[in-house]
Protein backbone atom coordinates (compact mmCIF):
# COMPACT_ATOMS: atom_id res chain seq x y z
CA UNK A 1 0.00 0.00 0.00
CA UNK A 2 1.45 3.34 -1.08
CA UNK A 3 1.24 5.89 1.75
CA UNK A 4 2.81 9.16 2.86
CA UNK A 5 4.88 9.88 5.95
CA UNK A 6 1.75 11.37 7.50
CA UNK A 7 0.21 7.90 7.47
CA UNK A 8 2.99 6.27 9.49
CA UNK A 9 5.11 8.78 11.43
CA UNK A 10 2.51 10.36 13.76
CA UNK A 11 1.62 6.85 14.94
CA UNK A 12 5.31 6.12 15.48
CA UNK A 13 5.74 9.28 17.53
CA UNK A 14 2.71 8.42 19.65
CA UNK A 15 3.79 4.80 20.07
CA UNK A 16 7.46 5.57 20.82
CA UNK A 17 8.91 3.54 17.96
CA UNK A 18 10.57 4.53 14.69
CA UNK A 19 9.95 3.75 11.04
CA UNK A 20 13.04 2.99 8.97
CA UNK A 21 13.95 4.60 5.68
CA UNK A 22 16.15 2.28 3.64
CA UNK A 23 17.65 3.47 0.38
CA UNK A 24 16.26 1.36 -2.45
CA UNK A 25 18.40 2.38 -5.39
CA UNK A 26 18.40 -1.06 -7.06
CA UNK A 27 15.75 -3.71 -7.62
CA UNK A 28 17.53 -6.11 -5.25
CA UNK A 29 17.60 -3.54 -2.44
CA UNK A 30 13.89 -2.85 -2.93
CA UNK A 31 13.02 -6.56 -2.95
CA UNK A 32 14.99 -7.23 0.22
CA UNK A 33 13.41 -4.25 2.00
CA UNK A 34 9.86 -5.23 1.04
CA UNK A 35 10.47 -8.85 2.04
CA UNK A 36 11.61 -7.75 5.50
CA UNK A 37 8.68 -5.36 5.92
CA UNK A 38 6.05 -7.91 4.93
CA UNK A 39 7.57 -10.69 7.00
CA UNK A 40 7.71 -8.52 10.13
CA UNK A 41 4.49 -6.59 9.50
CA UNK A 42 6.32 -3.27 9.52
CA UNK A 43 5.61 0.05 7.82
CA UNK A 44 8.63 1.07 5.77
CA UNK A 45 10.03 3.92 3.70
CA UNK A 46 11.72 3.40 0.34
CA UNK A 47 14.32 6.10 -0.17
CA UNK A 48 16.69 7.44 -2.75
CA UNK A 49 18.80 10.58 -2.48
CA UNK A 50 19.56 13.06 -5.23
CA UNK A 51 23.27 12.24 -5.04
CA UNK A 52 22.42 8.59 -5.77
CA UNK A 53 20.47 9.31 -8.96
CA UNK A 54 23.49 8.67 -11.23
CA UNK A 55 23.11 5.00 -10.26
CA UNK A 56 19.39 4.89 -11.12
CA UNK A 57 17.27 7.77 -12.39
CA UNK A 58 14.08 9.02 -10.78
CA UNK A 59 12.13 7.82 -13.80
CA UNK A 60 13.50 4.27 -13.53
CA UNK A 61 13.07 4.15 -9.75
CA UNK A 62 9.49 5.40 -10.02
CA UNK A 63 8.65 2.54 -12.37
CA UNK A 64 10.12 0.05 -9.88
CA UNK A 65 9.29 1.42 -6.44
CA UNK A 66 5.78 2.84 -6.85
CA UNK A 67 4.18 -0.37 -8.22
CA UNK A 68 6.01 -2.39 -5.55
CA UNK A 69 4.65 -0.08 -2.86
CA UNK A 70 1.10 -0.33 -4.19
CA UNK A 71 1.27 -4.14 -4.26
CA UNK A 72 2.83 -4.46 -0.82
CA UNK A 73 0.86 -5.93 2.08
CA UNK A 74 2.24 -3.24 4.39
CA UNK A 75 2.32 0.59 4.25
CA UNK A 76 5.20 1.80 2.06
CA UNK A 77 6.29 5.42 1.59
CA UNK A 78 8.23 6.23 -1.60
CA UNK A 79 10.47 9.13 -0.59
CA UNK A 80 13.01 11.36 -2.32
CA UNK A 81 15.65 11.92 0.35
CA UNK A 82 17.93 14.97 0.35
CA UNK A 83 16.41 16.64 -2.67
CA UNK A 84 18.88 19.45 -3.29
CA UNK A 85 17.20 21.22 -6.19
CA UNK A 86 13.63 22.40 -6.67
CA UNK A 87 13.49 20.79 -10.11
CA UNK A 88 14.40 17.36 -8.70
CA UNK A 89 11.70 17.57 -6.05
CA UNK A 90 9.10 18.64 -8.60
CA UNK A 91 10.07 15.76 -10.89
CA UNK A 92 9.69 13.26 -8.03
CA UNK A 93 6.22 14.59 -7.22
CA UNK A 94 5.12 14.47 -10.86
CA UNK A 95 6.38 10.87 -11.13
CA UNK A 96 4.22 9.86 -8.17
CA UNK A 97 6.61 9.81 -5.22
CA UNK A 98 4.46 10.04 -2.10
CA UNK A 99 7.02 12.01 -0.11
CA UNK A 100 10.04 14.27 -0.59
CA UNK A 101 12.75 15.94 1.43
CA UNK A 102 13.87 19.38 0.30
CA UNK A 103 17.27 19.83 1.92
CA UNK A 104 18.17 23.52 2.09
CA UNK A 105 20.04 23.15 5.38
CA UNK A 106 23.31 24.53 3.98
CA UNK A 107 21.58 27.77 2.95
CA UNK A 108 20.94 30.62 5.39
CA UNK A 109 18.22 29.94 7.94
CA UNK A 110 15.87 32.50 6.40
CA UNK A 111 16.35 31.11 2.90
CA UNK A 112 15.93 27.57 4.22
CA UNK A 113 12.56 28.52 5.70
CA UNK A 114 11.37 30.34 2.58
CA UNK A 115 12.45 27.66 0.11
CA UNK A 116 11.06 24.76 2.13
CA UNK A 117 7.77 26.60 2.75
CA UNK A 118 7.31 27.05 -1.00
CA UNK A 119 8.04 23.38 -1.67
CA UNK A 120 5.81 22.25 1.22
CA UNK A 121 2.84 24.03 -0.36
CA UNK A 122 3.56 22.29 -3.67
CA UNK A 123 4.06 18.86 -2.11
CA UNK A 124 0.84 19.12 -0.14
CA UNK A 125 -1.05 20.07 -3.32
CA UNK A 126 0.07 16.70 -4.71
CA UNK A 127 -1.15 14.93 -1.58
CA UNK A 128 2.47 14.15 -0.68
CA UNK A 129 4.40 14.70 2.55
CA UNK A 130 7.59 16.71 2.96
CA UNK A 131 10.61 16.65 5.25
CA UNK A 132 12.92 19.56 6.02
CA UNK A 133 16.21 19.87 7.89
CA UNK A 134 17.79 22.46 10.14
CA UNK A 135 21.26 22.27 11.57
CA UNK A 136 23.71 20.17 9.61
CA UNK A 137 24.28 16.40 9.60
CA UNK A 138 27.95 15.76 8.81
CA UNK A 139 29.41 13.64 6.02
CA UNK A 140 27.96 13.15 2.55
CA UNK A 141 24.80 11.19 1.76
CA UNK A 142 25.87 7.88 0.23
CA UNK A 143 29.46 8.23 1.46
CA UNK A 144 31.38 5.21 2.74
CA UNK A 145 32.92 6.93 5.76
CA UNK A 146 32.25 10.02 7.86
CA UNK A 147 34.64 12.27 9.74
CA UNK A 148 33.58 13.45 13.19
CA UNK A 149 34.12 17.18 13.65
CA UNK A 150 35.19 18.53 17.03
CA UNK A 151 33.20 21.74 16.48
CA UNK A 152 30.10 19.99 15.11
CA UNK A 153 27.98 21.15 18.07
CA UNK A 154 27.75 24.64 16.59
CA UNK A 155 25.66 23.14 13.77
CA UNK A 156 23.26 21.29 16.09
CA UNK A 157 19.54 22.01 15.95
CA UNK A 158 18.07 24.03 18.83
CA UNK A 159 14.52 23.57 20.19
CA UNK A 160 13.75 27.22 19.43
CA UNK A 161 14.83 26.87 15.80
CA UNK A 162 12.87 23.63 15.43
CA UNK A 163 9.66 25.25 16.66
CA UNK A 164 10.07 28.30 14.45
CA UNK A 165 11.00 26.25 11.38
CA UNK A 166 8.03 23.89 11.69
CA UNK A 167 5.59 26.76 12.19
CA UNK A 168 6.95 28.74 9.24
CA UNK A 169 7.29 25.89 6.74
CA UNK A 170 4.54 23.38 7.58
CA UNK A 171 6.83 20.38 7.09
CA UNK A 172 5.50 16.94 8.03
CA UNK A 173 8.82 15.64 9.39
CA UNK A 174 11.93 17.39 10.66
CA UNK A 175 15.50 16.13 10.35
CA UNK A 176 17.60 17.40 13.23
CA UNK A 177 21.36 17.57 13.76
CA UNK A 178 22.31 15.99 17.08
CA UNK A 179 25.74 14.43 16.46
CA UNK A 180 25.32 11.86 13.69
CA UNK A 181 26.99 11.87 10.25
CA UNK A 182 26.38 10.18 6.91
CA UNK A 183 28.51 7.10 6.23
CA UNK A 184 30.43 4.80 8.58
CA UNK A 185 32.28 6.46 11.44
CA UNK A 186 36.04 6.66 11.87
CA UNK A 187 35.48 7.87 15.44
CA UNK A 188 32.55 7.16 17.82
CA UNK A 189 29.72 9.69 17.35
CA UNK A 190 28.83 12.05 20.17
CA UNK A 191 25.04 12.08 20.32
CA UNK A 192 23.17 14.75 22.25
CA UNK A 193 20.24 12.74 23.62
CA UNK A 194 19.01 15.56 25.84
CA UNK A 195 18.73 17.80 22.80
CA UNK A 196 16.53 15.21 21.03
CA UNK A 197 14.27 15.02 24.08
CA UNK A 198 13.93 18.80 24.34
CA UNK A 199 13.12 19.20 20.65
CA UNK A 200 10.59 16.33 20.73
CA UNK A 201 8.83 18.03 23.64
CA UNK A 202 8.85 21.39 21.83
CA UNK A 203 7.37 20.38 18.46
CA UNK A 204 4.62 17.91 17.59
CA UNK A 205 6.16 17.17 14.18
CA UNK A 206 7.88 13.74 13.99
CA UNK A 207 11.67 13.94 14.21
CA UNK A 208 14.12 12.26 11.83
CA UNK A 209 17.59 10.88 12.50
CA UNK A 210 19.94 10.96 9.52
CA UNK A 211 23.36 9.34 9.49
CA UNK A 212 22.15 6.32 11.47
CA UNK A 213 24.54 3.74 10.05
CA UNK A 214 27.33 2.82 12.43
CA UNK A 215 25.49 3.70 15.64
CA UNK A 216 25.21 1.08 18.37
CA UNK A 217 21.93 -0.64 19.16
CA UNK A 218 21.82 1.24 22.44
CA UNK A 219 22.29 4.54 20.59
CA UNK A 220 19.27 3.79 18.43
CA UNK A 221 17.13 2.73 21.38
CA UNK A 222 18.02 5.87 23.29
CA UNK A 223 17.35 8.15 20.29
CA UNK A 224 13.92 6.58 19.77
CA UNK A 225 13.17 6.74 23.49
CA UNK A 226 14.05 10.45 23.43
CA UNK A 227 11.69 11.16 20.52
CA UNK A 228 13.03 10.07 17.10
CA UNK A 229 10.26 8.69 14.84
CA UNK A 230 12.14 8.02 11.58
CA UNK A 231 15.64 6.63 11.08
CA UNK A 232 17.52 6.67 7.77
CA UNK A 233 19.77 3.69 6.95
CA UNK A 234 21.91 2.92 3.93
CA UNK A 235 25.51 2.04 4.79
CA UNK A 236 24.62 -1.06 6.81
CA UNK A 237 22.43 -2.68 4.16
CA UNK A 238 24.81 -1.62 1.40
CA UNK A 239 27.71 -3.36 3.12
CA UNK A 240 25.56 -6.43 3.87
CA UNK A 241 24.73 -6.77 0.17
CA UNK A 242 28.35 -6.42 -0.94
CA UNK A 243 29.59 -8.86 1.71
CA UNK A 244 27.06 -11.48 0.60
CA UNK A 245 27.96 -11.02 -3.06
CA UNK A 246 31.67 -11.36 -2.34
CA UNK A 247 31.25 -14.43 -0.15
CA UNK A 248 29.06 -16.28 -2.64
CA UNK A 249 31.15 -15.31 -5.64
CA UNK A 250 34.23 -16.70 -3.91
CA UNK A 251 32.36 -19.91 -3.08
CA UNK A 252 30.69 -20.43 -6.44
CA UNK A 253 32.76 -18.51 -8.96
CA UNK A 254 29.63 -17.90 -11.04
CA UNK A 255 27.84 -14.94 -12.59
CA UNK A 256 25.70 -12.10 -11.27
CA UNK A 257 22.42 -14.02 -11.57
CA UNK A 258 23.72 -16.68 -9.20
CA UNK A 259 24.55 -13.99 -6.63
CA UNK A 260 21.17 -12.22 -6.58
CA UNK A 261 19.35 -14.55 -4.13
CA UNK A 262 22.11 -14.22 -1.54
CA UNK A 263 22.20 -10.43 -2.00
CA UNK A 264 18.43 -10.12 -1.48
CA UNK A 265 18.55 -12.41 1.56
CA UNK A 266 21.38 -10.41 3.13
CA UNK A 267 19.46 -7.17 2.64
CA UNK A 268 16.33 -8.74 4.10
CA UNK A 269 18.22 -9.93 7.19
CA UNK A 270 19.90 -6.55 7.71
CA UNK A 271 16.62 -4.62 7.33
CA UNK A 272 14.77 -7.07 9.61
CA UNK A 273 17.35 -6.52 12.34
CA UNK A 274 16.87 -2.76 12.10
CA UNK A 275 13.07 -3.05 12.16
CA UNK A 276 13.24 -5.16 15.30
CA UNK A 277 15.58 -2.61 16.84
CA UNK A 278 13.35 0.32 15.91
CA UNK A 279 10.29 -1.35 17.46
CA UNK A 280 8.13 -1.08 14.32
CA UNK A 281 7.52 -4.82 13.79
CA UNK A 282 3.80 -5.61 13.85
CA UNK A 283 2.91 -1.92 13.53
CA UNK A 284 1.77 -2.03 9.88
CA UNK A 285 -1.86 -2.44 10.89
CA UNK A 286 -2.05 0.86 12.78
CA UNK A 287 -1.03 3.04 9.84
CA UNK A 288 -3.57 5.32 8.19
CA UNK A 289 -5.23 4.45 4.92
CA UNK A 290 -2.67 5.83 2.46
CA UNK A 291 -2.58 8.65 -0.06
CA UNK A 292 -6.08 10.18 -0.16
CA UNK A 293 -8.10 9.49 -3.28
CA UNK A 294 -9.05 13.18 -3.59
CA UNK A 295 -5.40 14.18 -3.68
CA UNK A 296 -4.62 11.64 -6.37
CA UNK A 297 -7.61 12.78 -8.44
CA UNK A 298 -6.52 16.40 -8.08
CA UNK A 299 -3.02 15.49 -9.24
CA UNK A 300 -4.39 13.77 -12.35
CA UNK A 301 -6.68 16.69 -13.19
CA UNK A 302 -3.87 19.22 -12.75
CA UNK A 303 -1.56 17.17 -14.95
CA UNK A 304 -4.20 16.94 -17.70
CA UNK A 305 -4.80 20.70 -17.56
CA UNK A 306 -1.06 21.40 -17.73
CA UNK A 307 -0.71 19.17 -20.78
CA UNK A 308 -3.61 20.93 -22.53
CA UNK A 309 -2.00 24.32 -21.98
CA UNK A 310 1.31 23.18 -23.46
Residues of each region from the PLM?
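Protein-protein interaction and targeting regions used for scaffolding, dimerization, and localization
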Residues: 276-310
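Flexible, glycine/charged-enriched surface loops at secondary-structure junctions
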Residues: 126-133, 253-264, 279-293
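Glycine-rich beta-strand-to-loop/alpha-helix junction loops that act as flexible
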Residues: 179, 210-213
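Alpha/beta enzyme core
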Residues: 3-15, 25-52, 58-75, 82-203, ...
Amino acid sequence: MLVTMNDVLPQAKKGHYAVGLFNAVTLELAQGIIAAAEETGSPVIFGTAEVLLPYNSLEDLAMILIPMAKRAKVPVVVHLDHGLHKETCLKALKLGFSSIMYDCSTDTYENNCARVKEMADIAHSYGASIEGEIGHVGGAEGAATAEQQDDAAKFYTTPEEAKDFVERTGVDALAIAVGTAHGAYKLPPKLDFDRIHKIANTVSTPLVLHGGSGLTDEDFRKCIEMGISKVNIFTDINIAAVSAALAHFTDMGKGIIDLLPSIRDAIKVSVTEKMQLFGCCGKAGIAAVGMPDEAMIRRIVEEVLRNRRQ
